[in-house]
Swiss-Prot record:
Reported phenotype of the disruption mutant: No tail is synthesized.
Annotated region described as Disordered, given as residue ranges: 344-379
A Pfam family assignment: GpP_4th
Gene name tied to this protein: P
Protein's name in the database: Baseplate hub protein gp44
Primary role: Forms the central cylindrical hub of the baseplate and plays an important role in baseplate and tail assembly. Core component of the initiator complex that triggers the tail tube polymerization during tail assembly. Forms a conduit that probably functions as an extension of the tail tube allowing viral DNA release during ejection. Might facilitate the interaction of the virus with the host cell surface through electrostatic interactions during virus entry into host cell.
This protein's UniProt keywords: Host cytoplasm, Late protein, Viral baseplate protein, Viral contractile tail ejection system, Viral genome ejection through host cell envelope, Viral penetration into host cytoplasm, Viral release from host cell, Viral tail assembly, Viral tail protein, Virion, Virus entry into host cell
Post-translational modification (record): Cleavage of the C-terminus gives rise to a shorter 40 kDa form.
Organism, as annotated: Escherichia phage Mu
Domain notes: C-terminal region forms a flexible domain.
Length: 379
C-alpha cells in the first residue's frame, strides 16, 4: 500500500503533507486528524476552510470522513505553514442536541431510534448485530432535556449491551468488541517500543451498587428508609486479593438486575483502565496490508521480558508522520473484557420512575427529616 496522504475537500485534492496525525478510538464516536505542510505565498487555500466537507485517504484507503474544524496559518516573509484539523461527521452527534418530534418513541428499537436522531445530521447508521437482545424494542424511550445525540444513544446502547463507535466512512456503528485475533506484535520485529503499565489504585475487590425500590404507602408517610433502599448488585475482582470494597449509589430507581449490570460494568471498566499497553509499530499497515484501526484483537510477544499476552483489544490508533518520529503507528491496547458491555435497563424510561424525582426524592426527603438515620454511605 502507498503511504500517500490525500485530503479531498471542496472538489480538490490536497497532497504533499509533511506532518500527519490521524486518530481513531473505540471509545469515541468521531475520529480526527491534523495535517500540516509549508506552502509558498499565493497558494489558494479556500478549499481548506473550516466547515468544508472532506474525505481523508491513505494509499487509497479512507481513514476519516467529515468536516474541517480548524485551519491555522503561521507565516514568515517567505513562507507559510498551514495546519488543518477535522473530525468525522459523527462529531456533530457529540456536539449537538438530540431533537425529535415529541421527544419520545414507543416500541422502537435502538437501531430505529439511532436512525431517527442521526438523519438530520446526514449520518448513516451501521448495525452489525444479529442477536435478539440487542434488537429488542424499547416499550418507551424519552429524550432528556438538553442531552446530545451521543448522550441519548449511549444511554440506549447500555440498555441493550451494545458498543457504539464510528468508522472511517463517518458512519455511526453499533457492534461488539472483536473476538477473533488478527495480528501478533513481536518486540524487535514489527513492534518498536512497548510501554506496559499495571495500576491497581482504582481497582477494588468488590463493587456494590445500591439502588432504590418503591415502597408501599403514600408520599409523606413516615416510612423506614430500610424498606426503600433494598436493591443491590455485586461484582468481584479476583485479582484484587485484599479487602477493598466500593459502594456506588444509583442515581434513580433501579432493579436488582440493573444494579448487577451496573456493578459488572464498573468492574470491567476499571479493569480495562488498570492494565494498559502503549505500543509503537513500524509503519501504518498490518500484515494483510490494511491500515491499523481500532477494535482489532491482537497478541503481544515480548518474551525477552517475560511478557506474552493474548486477547488484547486495540482501543485507540494514531497514524503518525513527522520529522521527529518518521512514519509509525501508536496503538493503545487493553484487556478485551473491559469493553464487553453488560445490559442495563434504561432507568429513566421504566414505568413508575425517573431520574429527577420519584423514589429518589422520597429517600432524600426522608433523610432530610431524619438526619440521625442517614447511613454512612450517604454521608
Amino acid at each position: 500500500m502507498s503511504n500517500t496522504v490525500t485530503l479531498r475537500a471542496d472538489g480538490r485534492l490536497f497532497t504533499g503533507w509533511t506532518s500527519v496525525s490521524v486518530t481513531r478510538s473505540i471509545e469515541s464516536v468521531a475520529g480526527y486528524f491534523e495535517l500540516g505542510v509549508n506552502v509558498p505565498p499565493g497558494t489558494d487555500l479556500s478549499g481548506l476552510a473550516p466547515g468544508k466537507k472532506f474525505t481523508l485517504e491513505i494509499g487509497g484507503q479512507i481513514v476519516c470522513t467529515g468536516y474541517i474544524d480548524s485551519r491555522r496559518r503561521q507565516m514568515t516573509a517567505d513562507s507559510m505553514k498551514i495546519t488543518v484539523a477535522g473530525r468525522d461527521k459523527t462529531a456533530d452527534l457529540i456536539d449537538c442536541a438530540a431533537v425529535y418530534s415529541g421527544g419520545q418513541w414507543k416500541n422502537r428499537t435502538l437501531e430505529q431510534i439511532a436512525r431517527d436522531l442521526c438523519a438530520p445530521y446526514g449520518v448513516t447508521v451501521r448495525w452489525e448485530l444479529s442477536d435478539k437482545e440487542s434488537s429488542a424494542a424499547f416499550p418507551g424511550f424519552t429524550l432528556d432535556h438538553s442531552e446530545t445525540v451521543y448522550e441519548a444513544l449511549v444511554r440506549a446502547s447500555r440498555a441493550r449491551g451494545v458498543l457504539m463507535t464510528s468508522n472511517a466512512a463517518g458512519e455511526l456503528v453499533f457492534s461488539r468488541a472483536a473476538s477473533t485475533a488478527t495480528d501478533e506484535l513481536v518486540l524487535g520485529e514489527n513492534l518498536l517500543t512497548l510501554d506496559f503499565e499495571e495500576d491497581f489504585r482504582d481497582r477494588f475487590s468488590e463493587y456494590t451498587v445500591k439502588g432504590y425500590a418503591r415502597a408501599n404507602g403514600a408520599e409523606g408517610d413516615d416510612i423506614d428508609a430500610k424498606s426503600i433502599v433494598s436493591r443491590k448488585g455485586t461484582a468481584t475482582d479476583s485479582d484484587v486479593t485484599r479487602y477493598r470494597p466500593m459502594i456506588i449509589i444509583a442515581d434513580s430507581k433501579i432493579t436488582a438486575k440493573d444494579a448487577q449490570a451496573r456493578a459488572l460494568r464498573e468492574q470491567r471498566r476499571r479493569l480495562a483502565k488498570s492494565i494498559t499497553f502503549e505500543a509503537e509499530i513500524d509503519g501504518w499497515t498490518r500484515k494483510d496490508g490494511q491500515l491499523w484501526m481500532p477494535n482489532l484483537l491482537v497478541t503481544i510477544d515480548a518474551s525477552k521480558y517475560a511478557i506474552k499476552t493474548t486477547e488484547l483489544l486495540v482501543s485507540k490508533v494514531t497514524l503518525i508522520l513527522n520529522d521527529q518520529d518518521g512514519l509509525k503507528t501508536r496503538v493503545s491496547l487493553a484487556p478485551r473484557e473491559g469493553f464487553l458491555v453488560p445490559v442495563e435497563s434504561d432507568r429513566k424510561n421504566r414505568k413508575g420512575g425517573d431520574s429527577n424525582g420519584g423514589i429518589d426524592a422520597l429517600v432524600e426527603d426522608y433523610y432530610r427529616r431524619h438526619p440521625e438515620k442517614t447511613p454512612p454511605w450517604k454521608e
